[in-house]
């Protein structure tokens, strides 16, 4: 998937069948990993070699939980005082091999797309803490609405055209 085409459901099913194939690994799969990756593997025992594994796999250690870093984007989150209305993915990152190879459209996973879209969330949170002079008091609002769409499918608040002022729409 180079990003310009769509992965059909049949292709994803075929990928799943390919992933079920096994191979015998004769080397330590922790060699050459970054400190961050090794930290995620703490508590996961290394199997005795050689070991039979699936050709492509989504392992529990591929899923990186949010912990206390989940941004307050859910509409019902009590920390959400900005009116965000976004669906955060279940995990902060999902580095599963099958998960990443099964992207139906484009090249970004839901987790990666959320990280990109989170820039406006962080921008609004930061800008709302700054003491803007009266003439610039709308800067946080204007910055936060540049990804909204008139049909209400934009982010970070899913505002529709009737909720957006003319400056918000520009």
Question: Which residue ranges define each predicted feature?
Answer:
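Metal-dependent catalytic cores of enzymes that make or break cyclic nucleotides
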Residues: 1-170
């Amino acid at each position: 998937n180079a990003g310009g085409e769509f992965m059909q459901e049949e292709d994803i099913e075929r990928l799943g069948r390919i992933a079920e194939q096994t191979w015998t690994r004769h080397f330590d799969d922790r060699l050459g990993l970054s400190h961050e990756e090794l930290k995620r593997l703490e508590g996961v025992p290394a199997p005795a070699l050689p070991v039979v594994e699936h050709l492509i796999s989504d392992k529990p250690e591929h899923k990186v939980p949010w912990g206390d870093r989940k941004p307050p984007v859910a509409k019902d989150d009590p920390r959400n005082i900005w009116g965000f209305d976004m669906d955060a993915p279940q995990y902060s990152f999902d580095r599963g091999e099958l998960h990443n190879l099964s992207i139906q459209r484009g090249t970004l996973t839901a987790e990666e797309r959320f990280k990109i879209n989170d820039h406006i969330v962080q921008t609004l949170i930061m800008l709302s803490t700054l003491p803007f002079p009266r003439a610039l008091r709308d800067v946080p609002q204007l910055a936060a609405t540049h990804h909204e769409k008139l049909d209400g499918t934009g982010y970070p608040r899913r505002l529709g055209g009737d909720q957006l002022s003319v400056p918000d729409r520009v």
